[in-house]
Curated annotation (Swiss-Prot):
This is Ribosomal RNA small subunit methyltransferase A. It comes from the Bacteria. The gene is rsmA. HAMAP family: 16SrRNA_methyltr_A. Disulfide bonds: none annotated.
Length: 280
């Protein structure tokens, strides 16, 4: 097995995790069983891949963009019948295993520059979630992104991303990851997060979700303003006040103070009001 003199490439956002304790925490959070098929994004030199293959997981399928690393990974793990490797961009290549089966869990050290698009590919959008959802995703992301994903209403980091992710999955922190845990050290702190996607039947109806998306774009465009001044709807103010009260929302609130489920109730109330008005 040889990776030659390969050094991390900035254009690929490569920062290789080398801290043994963090690698163990990722594996523990994945909670792999013998019926799990794991999709690993960005295996690098295979530090985590080695642990995944040492677990009881039925299969480990890695996706690596850097051609220079692919040969080394194949040399190192290619003899294992439980290991498969695809060279390519994780945003573009098929994510199924070679036998056509789908992974049950995802473990990823996400390059910071593709966090948003990759989250959308792995979990989906509010109005178009991944179906069926993965059972669990354990992701290493920039700390700022992790804080936004798991933020609670009222926190300064609570954002439209917080609402979207929390309506799609249960989000929790696994552990902080300081720069010294990587080679080379990034300029920012990182965090391992765990996402357990909600079953489709526990997610809001896609029609409601489309309305939620419109509301979030309106409100968070001016996040410091009260909702009274940012929401653009067809209903008169008196009717809007009734709808927001029923959703548990005060129009004097700012968007970062409104819980995810309240956005859903607001969207549902507005859609019902629109339907009632159109039937007159």
């Amino acid at each position: 097995m040889s990776f030659g003199g390969h050094t991390p490439r900035k254009r690929f956002g490569q920062h290789w995790l080398r801290d043994e304790r963090v690698l163990d925490r990722i594996l523990d959070a994945s909670d792999l069983g013998d019926d799990d098929r794991v999709l690993e994004v960005g295996p690098g030199r295979g530090a985590l891949t080695e642990r995944l293959l040492a677990s009881s997981a039925a299969a480990v399928h890695a996706v690596e963009l850097d051609r220079d690393l692919v040969a080394g990974l194949q040399d190192r793990f290619g003899d294992s019948p439980r290991f498969s490797l695809r060279e390519g961009d994780v945003l573009a290549v098929p994510l199924t295993l070679p036998d056509g089966q789908r992974a049950t869990k995802v473990v990823a050290n996400i390059p910071y520059n593709i966090t948003g698009p990759l989250l959308e590919r792995l979990i989906g959008r509010l109005d178009q979630p991944v179906d069926p959802p993965y059972q669990r995703l354990v992701l290493l992301v920039q700390k700022e992104v992790a804080e936004r994903i798991r933020a609670r209403p009222g926190a300064s980091s609570f954002s439209a991303l917080s609402v979207r992710m929390q309506l799609l999955a249960k989000c929790s922190s696994v552990c902080p990851v300081p720069p010294r845990c990587f080679q080379p050290p990034p300029k920012v702190h990182s965090e391992v997060i765990r996402l357990d996607p909600l079953p489709l039947e526990q997610r809001p109806d896609p029609v409601i979700c489309r309305r939620v998306e419109r509301l979030l774009k309106q409100a968070f465009l001016a996040r410091r303003k009260m909702l009274r001044n940012t929401l653009t709807v067809s209903q008169p103010l008196s009717e809007l006040e009734t709808i927001t009260q029923q959703a548990g929302i005060d129009l004097r609130q700012r968007p970062q103070e409104v819980a995810p489920h309240a956005w859903v109730e607001l969207a549902r109330g507005l859609n019902q009001a629109d339907s009632a008005a159109s039937s007159l």
